[in-house]
């Protein structure tokens, strides 16, 4: 009889792992402590809740996360099914209605006869049986302690932040204009133009605004890919102009000129009744967010549906603990997945859950676990988190820097080179799937 598998945590990674197990006919006990016990970042008990942005970043094969998405589609990913079904306009990126997305994943998993849902907290590592731990960077204290004991090393951490969401009907449409950068795709973003004087006033107010107190917070522990806007602004007067307020490619159609700075708003739900402020992750006090962000042209009367907030994320010393199959080195049958392993980002977390779920299924079926080719985005992430020097281990997004370069004559055009790497990765994935997985 095939062994049942326990999956702890129904976030992006745990949901994907449960799906990969169930579609292979494996019975799954899926545990999720929410909504009975909430985390500092979550707001519901739904599966795969998106706690930060609603964007899953680029859909292009010239971008590593675009390659990762396509690989996951080829592997019948539940998270990619949901994202494609619930997308909202975002130019060349893939953004979703966060509530519809989470509902899609929840409905799919609760409808599967192979998956039994348990609304309860797990406070210890199961002593036996095949298990996937995917409790995320906000793992409850009791379980986090047990994981740390298992690791035999102190877990690492960084601080992550979310951007505010504002009501669409509170945006001054006479001031903002609709456009995607360089006119890629449809005009999907609302753009708030700033003059130099407006930018200088805003940047000065931002740097001097009062932040919320967070125990143990230090700027050095901020993840670069999700840096609070006020931390970025403090690095230099013009830093924001090369980051989230970059005006290049966003000419204002009202006068044909490129503003000095531009704040972008991205649609947050299918009804287009909410927008998030792109790149404005923050840990300012709520009152300060209202005061400072209402200085942005077009947002003078903005109504905040959700204020930005920050939380501490914990991750494992994976190079010392895991194999590239996401299985623990010292305990066969115990897998870890998601941001807690050191992959960073929604899609990356789901991707790790996909690999862990496939390998947990193989273990349950009496088959050998597999490691995905390092020429794929899925394989390169697993390779990175398990082979990097543990002393310098940091969370990492999908990146072409993790994937071996092309052989032969170097392609000078970066976009073309990246597309060729993606073509090779997808071909290698297809061959790997046919040889190793289609059995």
Curated annotation (Swiss-Prot):
Belongs to the MnmG family. TrmFO subfamily. The keyword Chloroplast does not apply. GO terms for cellular component: cytosol. The keyword Methyltransferase applies. It is found in: Cytoplasm. Keywords: Cytoplasm, FAD, Flavoprotein, Methyltransferase, NAD, NADP, Transferase, tRNA processing. This is Methylenetetrahydrofolate--tRNA-(uracil-5-)-methyltransferase TrmFO. GO terms for biological process: tRNA methylation; tRNA wobble uridine modification. It catalyses: uridine(54) in tRNA + (6R)-5,10-methylene-5,6,7,8-tetrahydrofolate + NADH + H(+) = 5-methyluridine(54) in tRNA + (6S)-5,6,7,8-tetrahydrofolate + NAD(+); uridine(54) in tRNA + (6R)-5,10-methylene-5,6,7,8-tetrahydrofolate + NADPH + H(+) = 5-methyluridine(54) in tRNA + (6S)-5,6,7,8-tetrahydrofolate + NADP(+).
């Amino acid at each position: 009889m095939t062994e049942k598998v326990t999956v702890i945590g129904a976030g992006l990674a745990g949901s994907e792992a449960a799906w990969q197990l169930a579609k292979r006919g494996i019975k799954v006990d899926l545990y999720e402590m929410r909504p009975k016990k909430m985390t500092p970042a979550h707001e519901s008990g739904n599966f795969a809740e998106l706690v930060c942005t609603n964007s899953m970043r680029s859909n292009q094969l010239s971008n590593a996360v675009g390659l990762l998405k396509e690989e996951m589609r080829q592997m019948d990913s539940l998270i990619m099914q949901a994202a494609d079904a619930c997308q909202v306009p975002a130019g060349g990126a893939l953004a979703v209605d966060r509530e519809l997305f989470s509902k899609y994943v929840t409905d799919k998993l609760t409808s599967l006869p192979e998956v039994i849902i348990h609304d309860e907290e797990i406070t210890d590592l199961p002593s036996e049986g095949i298990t996937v731990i995917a409790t995320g960077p906000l793992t409850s204290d009791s379980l986090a302690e047990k994981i740390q004991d298992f690791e035999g090393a102190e877990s690492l951490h960084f601080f992550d932040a979310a951007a505010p969401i504002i009501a669409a009907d509170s945006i001054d449409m006479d001031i903002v204009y609709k456009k995607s950068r360089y006119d890629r795709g449809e005009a999907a973003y609302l753009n708030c133009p700033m003059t130099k004087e407006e930018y200088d006033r805003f940047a000065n107010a931002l740097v001097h605004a009062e932040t919320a107190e967070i125990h143990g917070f230090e700027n050095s522990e901020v993840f670069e890919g999700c840096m609070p806007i006020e931390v970025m602004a403090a690095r230099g007067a013009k830093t924001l102009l090369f980051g989230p307020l970059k005006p290049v490619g966003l000419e204002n159609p009202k006068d044909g000129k490129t503003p000095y700075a531009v704040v972008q708003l991205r649609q947050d739900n299918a009804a287009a009744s909410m927008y998030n402020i792109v790149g404005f992750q923050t840990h300012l006090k709520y009152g300060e967010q209202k005061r400072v962000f209402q200085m942005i042209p077009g947002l003078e009367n903005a109504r905040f549906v959700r204020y930005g907030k920050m939380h501490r994320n914990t991750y494992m010393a994976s190079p010392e603990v895991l194999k590239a199959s996401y299985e623990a080195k010292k305990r066969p049958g115990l897998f870890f997945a998601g941001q807690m392993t050191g992959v960073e980002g929604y899609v990356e977390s789901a991707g790790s859950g996909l690999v862990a779920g496939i390998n947990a299924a193989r273990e349950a079926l009496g088959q050998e676990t597999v490691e995905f080719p390092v020429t794929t985005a899925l394989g390169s992430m697993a390779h990175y988190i398990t082979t990097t020097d543990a002393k310098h281990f940091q969370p990492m997004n999908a990146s072409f820097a993790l994937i071996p370069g092309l052989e032969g004559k170097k392609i000078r055009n970066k976009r073309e080179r990246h597309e060729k790497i993606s073509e090779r990765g997808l071909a290698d994935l297809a061959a790997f799937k046919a040889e190793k997985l289609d059995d």
